[in-house]
Each structure stands twice: as C-alpha cells, then as structure tokens.
Regions:
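Bacterial N-terminal signal peptides that target proteins for export
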Residues: 1-7
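Bacterial N-terminal signal peptides
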Residues: 7-15
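Sec/Tat signal peptide C-region and signal peptidase I cleavage site
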Residues: 16-22
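Non-transmembrane domains of secretory- and envelope-associated proteins
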Residues: 22-111, 231-313, 320-322, 358-435
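Solvent-exposed N-terminal domain segments of exported/luminal and surface proteins
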Residues: 23-211, 217
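Short, hydrophobic/aromatic-rich segments at coil-to-beta transitions
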Residues: 179-185, 211, 319-327, 350-354
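Short, surface-exposed coil-to-beta transition loops
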Residues: 195-198, 209-210, 335-340, 352, ...
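Feature captures eukaryotic membrane-trafficking machinery centered on endolysosomal pathways
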Residues: 324-358
C-alpha cells in the first residue's frame, strides 16, 4: 500500500511538472498567471514585471537556423579559432605575431570553454564583432523618457556609425591612419532646446588608448573634449548611456571580466521577423533600409488601453535560449557603475540583458534588448532583421525608463552597410551641426 501511495504521489508530481512546462511552451503567453514558472529564466527585476502584470509577452520558437551570417563568415570564424588568441591586455591578436590583425571577419573566438579563465572576454569580443558585422549605419530614431504611465519627454536623434573592422571589408575605409575600430556621431534633432547638440566618439584599437570623445552644445558655441568615463553617464539626462549602444559598447580592455556561467534564459525577440515579415529596401547610393512595420506598437505607451507599465515591450515576444552570463568590473573608479552583468546568446552572440550595479552592489539599471533573427540583404549578405526597434534602459530605483529604437515618423533612415566618409566624423567641424 505504501509503495502504491508513493507511486501515485510521484505520478502527480510529474504531471504537475509537465503542466508547468506546458505553460511555458511555445505558443503560450507569459503573464501574471504563470510568471513564477519563469523564475529561473529571467533577471529578477524583469520577472517581477510579469508577476505584477506589468509585462505580457507570447513565447515563440527561435531555432538556430533562424540566424545566419554572410557567406564566408563561418569559414572565417574557423580560421580565427586556429589563428587568434588574447594577449596580456585581452585584445585579440595573431598567435604567430602577437599583433592585432588589421581586419577580423567572423567570430574572433568561436570555441568557448567554461573552464577557460578568459571565456568571458572571448564571449564579449564575439558579441562586439557581431555588432560590427552589421556594418556602417544611420538611424533616425526617438528617445522616449517614460514613467510607469506615460511618455514624459521625447528627443529625436540622428545616429551614424562607421566601422573600420568586422563588417564585410569593402564597406570599410581603405585606409585607417588613426588605427580606429569605429567612429560614432549622435545629433539631436528635437526638441528645440536640444536641437543641434552633437556627441562624437572615436574608438581606437590600441587597448591602452582610451576613447576620444567630443561634445558640441549650441548654447555654448564650442566643441569640447569629454572624459571617457562620461560614456557611462545618462545621455541627455536619460537613463541610457553611450556605453549601452546596441547592448554593450564599452571598451572591453577597460574592464576586468569573469564568466558567471552558461544557462537557459528567456530573452526578447521579434515574432514577425521570425515569421519572415522583414522588409529590406536597397538604397540608390548603396546599402539597405529596413522600415519598421510595427513602429507604432513597439511599447506600452503607444498602445491604447495598455494595462502594464508604459515602457513594457508590446511587439516583442520571449524565446528560450542558452546564454552566457558575464560580469565586468570597470578599472576606472570614476565610472558610474561598479559592476556590469551581461547575458549573451551563446549562438547568435547578441545581447539580451545588461544589468548595472552601483559600486556598493545595488542594482541600478537593466538594459533590455531585442534579439531578432537575421534577414537577407542579397544572395550573399545577411544580418539582424526586425520589424521594430526596442532597447530599454530601466532605472529600477526611480521606476522609470528610457526607450530607444522606434523610428521617427516618415520614411527615415534605418540603414545599414551604407557608404560613409571618415571626414564626416571630424571633431574640428562638429560645430557645423549647430542651429
């Protein structure tokens, strides 16, 4: 009799376990009713949004086959596994010469082992080069300052990146006298009191050379150099920083990294992109534009009668992926954050969650990033393709967020692999953007 009772209890437990798993199966929705089933799959502060009914998202399947790279990328990654290593500064270098290559295509470190003491920084370099692979870009986008109930303020931004490495080589400048990785400029288009404000950055390959940063403020009518530590500060007073970028845009060598582990996780993705609804349009001067069909329903404040927090992702869905979890501590003690925790997809190497802590260990900010599948540009080139842009920096202490990614109204640039001239990024002429 006792044996029979134990068997019945075991069967009941298995049935309950099976039902719990079914609740998080593809096609179901994660919300208040079943959020506890995701407690080991999400950062606690994100899980809390689902438990409170502030976030609600469908769960979708994201097979590895949904993400493909350019022709030749896999072969280049395989060669990197043979030829690249890290030097003492943790930059990628050629094994034979101990010098950084002029050009790297593919994942610098395609073979990651958990027992490798350098695993974390190798994962990060793969993540960074995944961004570089996307190529030169220009995006006219909106930053939204959002309270739990509404949009408080907006700023239009015209953001341009030029990459000297990582992207297909014919898109990069033919010469690189400053030995740069990339150049970046952000021009504020609106509101009127900020119009003409510009921020410019140069990232050098030399691990000992800090980023060069300049800012132009029209009311001051001059260009001034800015400390690299300021890249962690809120951009235009928002909760988003320059070091956030696509996911993490800090210089890897400026941090000390360790691997926390590899785990299952839920991350945000684009269900319509997975369904093949991405639109690519070739541009007359070269490159491609990807208009956002879900631009007007990206986050809660845009949707009539939305019941969750105003910055909640609406067009996005959740998908279960394997992720690497990394921890970085800045070497510069003037850096705003004392620790950064990054969750990175272990196949696509796109970022999912970027958690930032104070020097005392308190969680301050969580950067929530969408990881869509790839979509083709042409028969041989492909990269991330989406129907909306959603990157949200949530200030968990102040209960507010900054949403980045939605495009400004009209047929505005959301462009990649476009031709760009290095002269566009000259700090001596930054004041040309002044109103």
């Amino acid at each position: 009799m006792r044996r029979l009772t134990l068997l019945v209890l075991l069967a009941a437990a298995l049935a309950l376990g099976g039902r719990a798993r079914a609740e998080l199966a593809v096609g179901t929705t994660l919300d208040r009713s079943n959020a506890d089933q995701a407690k080991d799959l999400l950062p606690p502060e994100i899980l809390s949004h689902y438990q409170k009914g502030e976030y609600t998202n469908k769960i979708v399947d994201f097979p590895n086959s949904a993400f493909q790279w350019d022709d030749g990328y896999a072969e280049a990654s395989a060669q990197n596994a043979k030829n690249l290593t890290l030097d003492a500064t943790k930059q990628p270098v050629d094994r034979a010469t101990n010098k950084r290559p002029d050009y790297i295509m593919g994942h610098p470190f395609p073979e990651i082992r958990e027992d490798d003491p350098d695993a974390a920084v190798k994962v990060l370099w793969n993540t960074i080069y995944t961004v570089y692979t996307g190529g030169n870009s220009r995006n006219v986008t909106v930053l939204d300052w959002v309270s739990p109930t509404r949009i408080e303020r907006e700023a239009g931004q015209d953001v341009t990146f030029l990459y000297y490495d990582g992207q297909p080589k014919h898109y990069s400048p033919t010469s690189n006298p400053e030995d740069l990785l990339f150049q970046f400029i952000a021009l504020t288009l609106s509101p009127a009191d900020l119009q003409g404000t510009a921020a410019l950055s140069w990232r050098y390959k030399d691990p000992a050379k800090r980023d060069a940063n300049w800012a132009y403020v029209p009311s001051l009518r001059r260009v001034r150099a800015v400390s690299p530590a300021n890249r962690s500060d809120g951009f235009l007073g928002s909760d988003l920083s320059q070091d956030d970028g696509n996911f993490f845009d800090g210089k890897p060598e400026d941090f000390t990294w360790r691997l926390i582990g590899r785990r299952d996780a839920l991350r945000m993705t684009d269900p319509d992109a997975l369904a093949g609804k991405v639109v690519r349009r070739p541009l007359p001067g070269g490159g491609w534009r990807t208009p956002f069909s879900n631009n007007d329903r990206t986050f809660g404040a845009q949707v009539k009668d939305w019941k969750g927090v105003a910055w909640a992702p609406v067009a996005g869905a959740l998908t279960k992926r394997k992720v690497w979890v990394l921890e970085g501590v800045p070497k510069d003690h003037y850096y705003l954050y004392g620790k950064i925790e990054l969750w990175v997809d272990d196949y696509t190497y796109t970022g999912a969650w970027n958690r930032k802590f104070s020097w005392q260990g308190d969680l301050l900010n969580t950067y929530q990033v969408t990881g869509p599948p790839s979509a083709p540009y042409n028969a041989t080139e492909r990269w991330l393709g989406s129907t909306f842009g959603y990157q949200t920096a949530e200030n968990v202490k102040a209960s507010r967020a900054t949403v980045a990614g939605p495009s400004m109204p009209g047929d505005v640039p959301d462009d990649r692999r476009i031709p760009l001239a290095p002269s566009f990024f000259d700090y001596q002429t930054l004041n040309r953007f002044g109103k």
